[in-house]
């Protein structure tokens, strides 16, 4: 820190120079991110609520009301009229909260002290963080030939210490939806906590269904589902950080509650103490501003771009790994390693990522990627081919 103050002009000049090194979503060349540029109206509202603290809701009753309304609105999308939950920093925190709820609930009501969680091999790395933080043993269920969790593998791995089963609605690498209906039945029959990580698909699948896309049930319409992660800062167009965790029952929050004697509420269940209300307010605003019609149009456009890109790849001669269920396309060159292809694309200014299972170039078709961007990308891929 400098001894003497520096002018705003000089500080902003320095920050602008530093920020120029960042990649911008608006360039359309960030291809591997599940996040995108927030809607301008959501950004405006976010700034309006910067000083609100949901960690002390008695002081910010209006903002707490907004959070409750957002959870209720998301709950309606996920087939539950009275959900419980919070707007948090993202899918990682939401998944950690879900695993903490599962562990604490099993410890209180089943006496399980050394818990195990069954997750697919395709699960997000946040579950490894959760297991490490809460001393849970991870049991990785195998994937089937379609890269979805193998139901038989889940059955085989259930034990007396199983505190949770996890399924994914929109896998990180391929955007696939696990057989959640079958897993819900298994979890329900065995009285095991069942969590659905719909961080990616939760703000897309409900709207795609409304415009004619077919998806099996994945939400609270299934009696075995105990909690769902959903991220407004992905397809919801809310600013980062805005994640959501919804629970079927209040008791899942209660088993995580700790005393907070010097605040305006007696207990607190979230991991983070001080929580900005800005994310809740921005999510509230953009959900009202876009409405069902706006999100249906957005989801439809993303899938149109997905199909356009997939068909373009196949015309050139690239191998598409799986038929896209959501707006992710994974592909390979028939005669080139994925990492080598990624390097060539990076040299051309495209920011791609490489999936690990299977190894393939992974492109996430988010809102900042236009059809023209995809045409330019396909042209470069043609030259590489």
From Swiss-Prot:
| Any GO BP | methanofuran biosynthetic process
Domain of life where this protein originates: Archaea
- Annotated EC: 4.1.1.11, 4.1.1.25
InterPro entries per record: GrpII_AminoAcid_Decarb (IPR050477), MfnA (IPR020931), PyrdxlP-dep_de-COase (IPR002129), PyrdxlP-dep_Trfase (IPR015424), PyrdxlP-dep_Trfase_major (IPR015421), PyrdxlP-dep_Trfase_small (IPR015422), Pyridoxal-P_BS (IPR021115)
Reaction(s) catalyzed by this protein? L-tyrosine + H(+) = tyramine + CO2; L-aspartate + H(+) = beta-alanine + CO2
Carrying N6-(pyridoxal phosphate)lysine, the residues are 234
Could you list this entry's UniProt keywords, alphabetically sorted: Decarboxylase, Lyase, Pyridoxal phosphate
Catalytic EC class: lyase
Question: What cofactor does this protein call for?
Answer: pyridoxal 5'-phosphate
Any Pfam family from its record, for instance, is Pyridoxal_deC
In which pathway is this protein known to take part? Cofactor biosynthesis; methanofuran biosynthesis; Cofactor biosynthesis; coenzyme A biosynthesis
What GO molecular-function term can you cite, just one? tyrosine decarboxylase activity
Which family does the entry's similarity section mention? Belongs to the group II decarboxylase family. MfnA subfamily.
Q: What does this protein do?
A: Catalyzes the decarboxylation of L-tyrosine to produce tyramine for methanofuran biosynthesis. Can also catalyze the decarboxylation of L-aspartate to produce beta-alanine for coenzyme A (CoA) biosynthesis.
Descriptive protein name:
Probable L-tyrosine/L-aspartate decarboxylase
Q: Which organism is it from?
A: Methanobrevibacter smithii (strain ATCC 35061 / DSM 861 / OCM 144 / PS)
Lineage summary: Archaea, Methanobacteriati, Methanobacteriota, Methanomada group, Methanobacteria
